[in-house]
């Protein structure tokens, strides 16, 4: 078993004395830093490598802090309109996970880089901390690497804003089987469009 395998097993037992101490120290350290900053190296090298990170030119790690809790509905001057059933403002739950929100915020700040993936690093009562793996599509080390140069294509710009990363896909309801009948055809919208379209068959 390699060294990364041992590190992976450590992170599976987050309630152990070692991990509780380590995460407590790290959360304190992250709390002193700004909300968004570049990390010199990944805090979880085993996880980063499993998600595609390489310690080479063109790859970078950015750490971001996201506020925990539900999403308050943005209503101007408290005007919700419609029927009382849809007047809720406070107790609404967001469709997307906080990890997907973190990827989006990093991607917006760094428009010239591409979001490859992200992972959880720590959390406290008020915030969750994620590290996002960014790739520079203009760097020659990336463009010449056959394993990762797919991300240089223009079609992969802002993958995080279109739900194409691992965290983004989790909230799209994609899958196979009877539980995922609401996304047959590729997406919720495609499924709705197919079911609600008027089909006028021509019989000859």
UniProtKB/Swiss-Prot annotation:
One of its GO terms (cellular component) is cytosolic large ribosomal subunit. One of its GO terms (molecular function) is RNA binding. It holds the Pfam family Ribosomal_L15e. Keywords: Ribonucleoprotein, Ribosomal protein. GO terms for biological process: cytoplasmic translation. SUPFAM superfamilies: Ribosomal proteins S24e, L23 and L15e (SSF54189). InterPro entries: Rbsml_eL15_core_dom_sf (IPR024794), Ribosomal_eL15 (IPR000439), Ribosomal_eL15_CS (IPR020925), Ribosomal_uL23/eL15/eS24_sf (IPR012678). It comes from the Eukaryota. PANTHER family: LARGE RIBOSOMAL SUBUNIT PROTEIN EL15, RIBOSOMAL PROTEIN L15. Belongs to the eukaryotic ribosomal protein eL15 family. This is Large ribosomal subunit protein eL15.
């Amino acid at each position: 078993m390699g060294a990364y395998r041992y590190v992976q097993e450590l992170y599976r037992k987050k309630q152990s004395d070692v991990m509780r101490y380590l995460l407590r120290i790290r959360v304190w350290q992250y709390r002193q830093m700004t909300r968004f900053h570049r990390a010199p190296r990944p805090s979880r090298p085993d996880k980063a490598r499993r998600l595609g990170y390489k310690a080479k030119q063109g790859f970078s790690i950015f750490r971001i802090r996201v506020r925990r809790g539900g999403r308050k509905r943005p209503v101007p001057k408290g005007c919700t309109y419609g029927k009382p059933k849809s007047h809720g403002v406070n107790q609404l739950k967001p469709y997307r996970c906080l990890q997907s929100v973190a990827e989006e915020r990093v991607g917006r700040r760094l428009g010239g880089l591409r979001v490859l993936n992200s992972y959880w690093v720590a959390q406290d009562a008020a915030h969750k901390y994620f590290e996002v793996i960014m790739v520079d599509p203009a760097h020659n080390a990336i463009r010449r690497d056959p394993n990762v140069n797919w991300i240089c294509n223009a079609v992969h710009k802002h993958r995080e804003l279109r739900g194409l990363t691992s965290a983004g896909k989790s909230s799209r309801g994609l899958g196979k089987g009877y539980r995922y009948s609401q996304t047959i055809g590729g997406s919720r919208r495609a499924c709705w469009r197919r079911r609600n379209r008027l089909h006028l068959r021509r019989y000859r």
